Amino acid sequence: MKVLIVGLGLIGGAYAYRLKNKGYKVYATDINLESIQFAKEHSYIDDGSCEALDFIRDVDMVILSIYPQAILEFLKKYSKYFKENQIITDVCGVKSSFVLEATELSKPAIYCSHHPMAGREKSGVKYSKECKFEGANFLITPTRETSYKTVEILRKLGTDLGFKRITAMDIYEHDKMIGFTSQLAHAIAVSLVNSDNNPNNTKKYIGDSYRDLTRIAMINDTLWSELFLENKENLVKHINCFQKNLDELKYALMNDDKETLESLFKSSTIIRKEMEKKWRN
């Protein structure tokens, strides 16, 4: 299969590296010529250019690894060059704000979005080889127009990339769940780090708990600002629910309520253990 990857950042670079090693013919485009040159020099891609039109007519699949707001702009500019049965997909972390419009803009090509649940704190193609997909989730978000054949092609893409669990779900359920499992987690990490009044002194006392909780606080501010705003209704609901649970813990502390604290801790332990069982299976 011939693929064009639009955007050679961390994820785009990781896709290029893995797919080329799986026998795909991989082309890439990026506004940064240095990223293209790096990918060519390290055999991540067969060829690359700063102009998507150099490859777009000749590939079977176009993978958009660009910011949410840039996706529709790209489609408006290049969809007239798409061909029938060509698959257009994206790796974006939110879906419902643009996928339906993207589906219409992409015709006569076939648009089907997906979301690789993986990444690193660092950004850029230079770090993409370190991006691990093994054991991670790969979410496909078909619409009513998406055929079974298209979903299966994306399933194979996820398998070839090395993902462990591949799930199909609608765009609205995706955004609801991602608002909790990904965006709320990032919001908590950011808030925890920013609540520190004396960060220079804190480093003397950091252990595994703080490191584990705050790893994702090193965040791409431009990308994540877009992701949060595109999914703000879901995220605000999750933040409110989290605050309610944190308040319950706070009030138990204020009232010396050991019984409630123990109940909260037991509940979280049981839920987390059940999650681990499902992950192992």
Write out the residue ranges for each language-model feature.
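Internal alpha-helical scaffold of NAD(P)-dependent oxidoreductase catalytic cores
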Residues: 130-215
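Rossmann-like NAD(P)-binding element
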Residues: 53-82, 86-87
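NAD(P)+-binding Rossmann beta1-loop-alpha1 motif at the extreme N-terminus of oxidoreductases
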Residues: 1-52, 56
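Interdomain hinge/lid region at the active-site interface
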Residues: 201-271
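Short beta->alpha hinge that forms the Motif I/post-I loop of the SAM-binding pocket
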Residues: 31, 66, 91
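Rossmann-like NAD(P)(H) cofactor-binding subdomain of soluble oxidoreductases
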Residues: 74-126
